[in-house]
Amino acid sequence: MLNKLSRLLADAGISLTDHQKTLLVAYVDMLHKWNKAYNLTSVRDPNEMLVRHILDSIVVAPYLQGQRFIDVGTGPGLPGIPLAIVLPDAHFTLLDSLGKRVRFLRQVQHELKLENITPVQSRVEAYPSEPPFDGVISRAFASLNDMVSWCHHLPGEKGRFYALKGQLPGDEIASLPDNFSVESVEKLRVPQLEGERHLVIIKSNKV
């Protein structure tokens, strides 16, 4: 699996250390193992996880601004854990309301010795934002409207919302509340992944 990951990274133009690659493969191994009992993802094949979970997460890294991020509705740690591995100087709070997912995240944190993640079991609306975050990240979490409505209290003054989407969500962008606007839309290239992938970056229009 390490060789396949190395080939995917080379195809994507992403350079990682051997240690980072080893951690990513170890995470996939854990996800595959725990998935049998905990049903954490519909993807069953570890090689497919490399594309649909690992690469699909880390291609976002160049667009993130800041040091403190919160991954809302993280599920089994996506995209937060792969991003934490490739961005060791940033910190990621991994938020999910389901206890079984958070138990898995804590086990990953323990086994991979990831000091830059904080797994939290909470509903996003109830989670405090002190200190505020530089970025709020979501992948398959909610519509853009729901994301900014439920998470509006989390980013700081210059914080951003980063929403990973498939096809360009034109209707969702058009229905954003007036106090939020799209700063940019980035088309993402994920080797061996069928279909389009986009990153929608949203900012608050608060004066």
Swiss-Prot record:
User: Using the chain's own numbering, where are the disulfide bonds?
Assistant: none
Residue sites binding S-adenosyl-L-methionine per the record: G73, L78, V124, E125, R139
Q: Name one GO cellular component term.
A: cytosol
Q: Which UniProt keywords apply?
A: Cytoplasm, Methyltransferase, rRNA processing, S-adenosyl-L-methionine, Transferase
What is the reaction catalyzed? guanosine(527) in 16S rRNA + S-adenosyl-L-methionine = N(7)-methylguanosine(527) in 16S rRNA + S-adenosyl-L-homocysteine
Please indicate if the UniProt record lists Methyltransferase as a keyword.
Answer: yes
- Cross-referenced InterPro entries, in alphabetical order? rRNA_ssu_MeTfrase_G (IPR003682), SAM-dependent_MTases_sf (IPR029063)
Give the enzyme's main class according to its UniProt record, as a single word: transferase
Q: What family does this chain come from, according to its entry?
A: Belongs to the methyltransferase superfamily. RNA methyltransferase RsmG family.
Chain's role: Specifically methylates the N7 position of guanine in position 527 of 16S rRNA.
Q: What is this protein called?
A: Ribosomal RNA small subunit methyltransferase G
Q: Look up and give the organism this protein is from.
A: Salmonella typhimurium (strain LT2 / SGSC1412 / ATCC 700720)
- The gene coding this protein: rsmG
